[in-house]
């Protein structure tokens, strides 16, 4: 993967994790309004709703973002080692 693709997928992964983490969990998450906790319609999918796909998608995006960040750090380390070969050596 080239540098542009690594950066792009890293940003997509980070933004996707932020979006999944910021998503409201439903009417029960609103504690300011007592009537908001009442069910207004039946659940869309009775076997867990959209929570499982959101969690799995968020984990996949998080793994993708971490992999891209590790790739960026690996490439940065190689460039620093090539430019400054004596920077990591300590004098006794």
From Swiss-Prot:
Intervals, Cytoplasmic compartment: 71-92
Membrane topology: Single-pass type I membrane protein
Consequences of knocking out this gene: Knockout mutant significantly impairs plaque and syncytia formation and decreases virus production.
Localization of this protein: Host Golgi apparatus membrane; Host endoplasmic reticulum membrane; Host endosome membrane
Transmembrane segments: 50-70
Coiled-coil stretches: none
Keyword Transmembrane helix in annotation: yes
Keyword terms, alphabetized: Glycoprotein, Host endoplasmic reticulum, Host endosome, Host Golgi apparatus, Host membrane, Membrane, Signal, Transmembrane, Transmembrane helix
Signal peptide: 1-22
Glycosylation sites recorded in the entry for this protein: 33
Entry's Gene Ontology cellular component terms: host cell endoplasmic reticulum membrane; host cell endosome membrane; host cell Golgi membrane; membrane
Regions of this protein lying in the Extracellular compartment: 23-49
Similarity comment text for this entry: Belongs to the alphaherpesvirinae glycoprotein J family.
Role this protein plays: Functions as an activator of viral protein expression and virus production. In turn, promotes cell-to-cell spread as well as syncytia formation.
Name of the protein in its database record: Envelope glycoprotein J
Lineage: Viruses, Duplodnaviria, Heunggongvirae, Peploviricota, Herviviricetes
């Amino acid at each position: 993967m080239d540098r542009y693709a690594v950066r792009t997928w890293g940003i997509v992964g980070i933004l996707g994790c932020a979006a999944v983490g910021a998503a409201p969990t439903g009417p029960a998450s609103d504690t300011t309004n007592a009537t908001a906790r009442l069910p207004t319609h039946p659940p869309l999918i009775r076997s867990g709703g959209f929570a499982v796909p959101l969690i799995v998608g968020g984990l996949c995006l998080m793994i993708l973002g971490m992999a891209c960040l590790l790739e960026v750090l690996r490439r940065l380390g190689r460039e620093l080692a090539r430019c400054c070969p004596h920077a990591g050596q300590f004098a006794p």
